[in-house]
Amino acid sequence: MALVGDFRQFESFFALYPSLMEVKNYLTQALTIDSAVYKRINALAGTTENTRVEFTYELGGNIRAIEQTYPLKSHTEAFYESHKKFVDFQLCVEGAEYFEVGYIKDFTPLTPYNESKDLTIYAKPITPPHRFFFHSGILGIFFPQDVHAGGLTYPIQSHTNAQDTTNITDLLTQPKKVVLKIPIEYFA
């Protein structure tokens, strides 16, 4: 079951997993304006607005931090994925994006599991997945049964003019975030 919420709400979660204290400390630094981690993530920028940039850092204990920024895409272009060996902790530091998340049994794999990438790719489900809005400070934790797609935008409809639809991309800025890859063994 995916967990999504303000990072400050996860105190009791981290209390259940003392082995994740380094993860909690790193995520705290990612949101602390004067920390080196925050400054590094906030400085991520491509040569153009539509460039994906990412850097990977080893945190120890087989935990990786992928600090990244990327252009947003329409929800119709969602890339649905899941992982077997790692749990994703995705924290938005700056900017914003939508995520779609659903239960693995509601999706049909497009590709077989790729063990070297720890990745299965899925087709868009018939049943609409849950939609979450990520902005600065929002953490999503995605377990192996959680198929997820991030970096999404949605058209919005004006409350005053039913004919007026605006792509929310115009209202969002490219996310600057971190994805922590945590081995599933930490949750056994």
Region spans (language model):
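A short, N-terminal "cap"/entry segment at the start of jelly-roll beta-barrel domains
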Residues: 1-66, 79
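A short beta-loop-beta micro-motif enriched in histidine and acidic residues
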Residues: 59-60, 75-88, 107-110, 127-128
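A short hydrophobic beta-strand segment most commonly corresponding to one strand
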Residues: 89, 139-141, 158-188
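Conserved metal-binding segment of the jelly-roll/cupin
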Residues: 132-154
